[in-house]
Amino acid sequence: MEELLFTGGTGFLGKNIGPVLDKMYNVTTCGITPHDDIKANLAKDVPDLPHHYDVVLHACGKAHVVPKTEAEKQLFFDINYIGTIHLCNALEKVGTPKALVFISTVAVYGCEFGELITEEHSLDGDTPVSYTHLRAHETELHL
């Protein structure tokens, strides 16, 4: 069975798709909750991954809140961008996965609610959420 690393896997998304993934992969979760297999605060540290993963599902991040202070904007930057850099650094140490799936937000497209979005949609978000997710996307493209 293939190995899957799921960041943020004990959150909302993990609770909903985790049971399906468990049937298809040997899932290891990575995050800040006591229920995560690998305890790591990606915003602060490069996690020590025990081995190579075939697939990485990167779902941890900060969204759905409008930061009101510079400190809150910095938190978005640290979690969404720096956290992704730390994850990529850890993955390089154990071998690049054959697939990296990054769960992002429609904010990178400047959208606040439903419309059909494709890969051709322009990236023109102008919020701290969109900025940090766009930087994270760019980082992952270099992995």
PLM region spans:
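Short-chain dehydrogenase/reductase
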Residues: 77, 126-134
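NAD(P)H-binding glycine-rich loop region in Rossmannoid oxidoreductase-like domains
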Residues: 45-79
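N-terminal Rossmann NAD(P)H-binding glycine-rich loop of SDR-like oxidoreductase domains
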Residues: 4-20
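Short alpha-helix in the Rossmann-fold core of NAD(P)-dependent oxidoreductases
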Residues: 77-84, 101
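Single conserved hydrophobic/aromatic residue that forms the stacking wall/gate
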Residues: 133-143
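Conserved Rossmann-fold NAD(P)-dependent oxidoreductase catalytic core, especially the SDR/UDP-sugar
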Residues: 86-127
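SDR active-site strand-loop-helix element
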Residues: 7, 30, 59, 100-106
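Adenosine-cofactor binding site in Rossmann-like domains, unifying the SAM/SAH pocket
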Residues: 30-45
